[in-house]
């Protein structure tokens, strides 16, 4: 039986604790990328601390999970991104983040307007930025205090799947989860 390579990249590492930032960090190899298994669309680095590079997609879906959460606590979720100077397709792209607790949890969505609003500045070679930024407001999710014996894995993602437009040049440096 032959093994067939997937068109998608499945996370292959766990989140690491960053005590300085009081956060848990996922490098690109620890995230799931739709179309990430195909080098025509994404370059997923094998080396730590290197960003994943979007070559081109019309369906952006990058997801991760975190299982070290505690009932009754609130968690802040975000991504650190930048753009290549020749990036395209982001000026009118409605980028969203989502989060939910457990497979059956209610999904919470947040539009990340700062990506399209600041695209011209971001693709000018600036340093990586956290999204959502202050203009978007923080993205936080509360784990129910009664969730003790339930599935409490935090699942989160970054999406732009609605326009069908091609997007290029996004660099994803990391995803992070911070206890508030």
UniProtKB/Swiss-Prot annotation:
Q: Where are the transmembrane segments?
A: none
Q: Where is the composition biased (Basic and acidic residues)?
A: 9-21
Show the segment(s) annotated as Disordered: 1-21
Which InterPro entries did the record assign? Answer: PP2-like
| Example of a GO MF term | carbohydrate binding
- Tell me any Pfam family this protein matches: PP2
Question: Could you identify this protein by its name?
Answer: Protein PHLOEM PROTEIN 2-LIKE A9
